Every structure is written in C-alpha cells, then in structure tokens.
Amino acid sequence: MDLQDAINQRHSIRQFTDKPVEKKMITKIVELAQRAPSWVNSQPWQVYCAMGDTLQAIKNAYRDQDIAGNQGNSDLPVMSREDWASQTQDNMKQWRHGIVHHFANFDEAHEKMTNASNTLYDSPVILYITIPKASPDWSIFDAGLFAENIMLAATAYGLGTIPTYNSVRFPAILHQTLNVPDDERFIVGISLGYSADTTINSYHSERRPVNEILHFN
C-alpha cells in the first residue's frame, strides 16, 4: 500500500474483532513510526502496549470507575466544546450530524457510539503513548506526529485504529497497571486490531474543502 492509499483509507475503527495481533506485527508498526520527526530529534515518546489480561484489567477498572460515576481526569486538560473556536465547533457539529444519519435514528447512533466508547471498542490492543512530564508543549506535537505514523503504518499492514481520550482518562489506573513511572504523562491511547464488518465502522467522516483551510499569500 502506498502512502496516499494509507492516508485515504485510515479512519476511526470503533469495533474490532477478537483476532489477536501478533507482537511481531506491533513491533514492526512502532519501529516504522519511530521515523517521525521531533524537536532536535528528542524522540520524547514511550509506548506501553496493553493486551490480554493487562488490557482486560484496565477495562475492568475503567468500568468500575464509570459505575461509580467518576468522569476521569486525563493528564492533558480537557476544554468544554462550547469554548472551542467556531470553525472547530462547526466541524464537530457536522460530524455528529453525519453519525446520526449513518444509523437509523439518533437513539441508535447514541447507543452504538456510547457502548463502543465505554468498552474501549473491544480492541485486543491499546498502545499508550507517554512523554516525560518535564517536556515542552512541542513534545505533545511530536507525540502527535508519532501517533499518526503508528496509525498509517497499521493501515498499511491491514489493521484498524482509533486514537481516544477515553482510553487515557484515568491515568492513575494506567500508571499502576502498566508500571509507568510517575514522571511520565499519558498523551493518548491508540486502539489497534482487525476491523469488524459492522455499520459503525463503515462511517467515514467528511473533511472541509481544501480551499477553506489553505491560504496562499
């Protein structure tokens, strides 16, 4: 698969099969992703791969937090969507509109999306990306470049992905379960696996026309 195909075919997968992903494949994906650029080649990222019993322990602990009514407290701050810029609010509104019309009605869309999110998409693997707490904001940008490389590489190898806030909203659980040092902070979790043939996975979000975001001077 060439780069253009990988970029166009990558989209968020919200339901995975139970087919396991081999460690050898995960290693290939992460090794390829390491070619991402970073400030002075700082390469601030670490990757913690949760699978099997470890991932199930995380899912169980998250479920317990949800039952207790805890909302989570991710290492990166979360801003109310009402405070986002108008253009980004419009984009999110269009995304929600597209999701609703992809299903029979709002109730079905809400149920499917909520269940998928609450179960961490039933993914067999989550790759947790961290950076040192002693990092500039630019390291978050670098981690994003690295994360995109992971998702493109996974697509090229026939796997699906979705990067989520939901996977990192209880960092204390992750530090304990994954044995992550306290001086690292969680940036994102990328669910990884083989895509299930379901309605929720056939949705592809739209993008703004390029002339609305590209400005020649």
Question: Residue spans of the language-model regions?
Answer:
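Acidic, surface-exposed loops and disordered segments
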Residues: 1-217
